């Protein structure tokens, strides 16, 4: 496996840290008045999702993670597992509920998403940045209720709850940002 020196660190680089694959979120080079230069690195553990900060002296190396990111199409959910397919090779992947995390609230059949594989096992699913979902349940908007800039909660067809403007009704299709869980606009 490839080893990376501290001076090769950049955001997005995948490394093995404490036995788990991690991605560099932020790399800060610190040059104190006295002493040796060091790097303060913020990592995101790709398995647990936790963020941790470590410092490294110049000259240290870390092993690169054998991580692949594939663009897969979501096929269906059978209750316990989620099924995806690579459109190039037609290879299918089965992912359990625990690995899906928050992504399951944003995926509609036939959507494309990014699946991260480590040692040929799926470890995370990243939905597209924006998805179009249908409103299944929400309170009716009251005419003339425009005093505030507030919204109302709406349950989407995937089960996720999103704050939407007062004019959105049941059956409407809305665009949702999956990174922030915010309403973007009508679809």
Curated annotation (Swiss-Prot):
Location(s), subcellular: Cytoplasm
Swiss-Prot/TrEMBL keywords: Cytoplasm, Elongation factor, Hydroxylation, Protein biosynthesis
Residues with the N6-(3,6-diaminohexanoyl)-5-hydroxylysine modification: 34
Pathway stated in the Swiss-Prot or TrEMBL entry: Protein biosynthesis; polypeptide chain elongation
GO BP annotations, alphabetical order: peptide biosynthetic process
InterPro entries linked to this entry: Elong-fact-P_C, NA-bd_OB-fold, Rib_uL2_dom2, Transl_elong_fac_P/YeiP, Transl_elong_KOW-like, Transl_elong_P/YeiP_cen, Transl_elong_P/YeiP_CS, Transl_elongation_fac_P
Annotated SMART domains: EFP, Elong-fact-P_C
A GO CC annotation given for this chain: cytoplasm
Pfam families tied to this protein: EFP, EFP_N, Elong-fact-P_C
Keyword Membrane: no
CDD domains: S1_EF-P_repeat_1 (cd04470), S1_EF-P_repeat_2 (cd05794)
Recorded family membership: Belongs to the elongation factor P family.
Name the UniProt record assigns to this protein: Elongation factor P
Lineage of source species: Bacteria, Pseudomonadati, Pseudomonadota, Gammaproteobacteria, Candidatus Pseudothioglobaceae
């Amino acid at each position: 496996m490839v080893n990376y020196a501290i001076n090769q660190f950049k955001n997005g680089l995948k490394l093995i840290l404490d036995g788990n694959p991690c991605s560099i979120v932020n790399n800060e080079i610190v040059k104190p008045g006295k002493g040796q230069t060091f790097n303060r690195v913020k990592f995101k553990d790709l398995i647990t999702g936790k963020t941790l900060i470590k410092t490294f002296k110049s000259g240290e190396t870390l092993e690169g993670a054998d991580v692949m990111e594939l663009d897969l199409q979501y096929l269906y959910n059978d209750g316990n597992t989620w099924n995806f397919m690579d459109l190039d090779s037609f290879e299918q992947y089965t992912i359990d509920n625990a690995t899906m995390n928050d992504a399951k609230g944003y995926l509609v059949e036939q959507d494309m998403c990014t699946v991260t594989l480590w040692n040929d096992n799926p470890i995370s699913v990243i939905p597209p940045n924006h998805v179009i979902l249908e409103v299944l349940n929400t309170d009716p908007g009251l005419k003339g209720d425009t005093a505030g800039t507030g919204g109302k909660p709406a349950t989407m067809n995937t089960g996720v709850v999103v704050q939407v403007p007062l004019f959105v009704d049941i059956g409407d299709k809305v665009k949702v940002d999956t990174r922030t869980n915010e309403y973007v606009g009508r679809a």
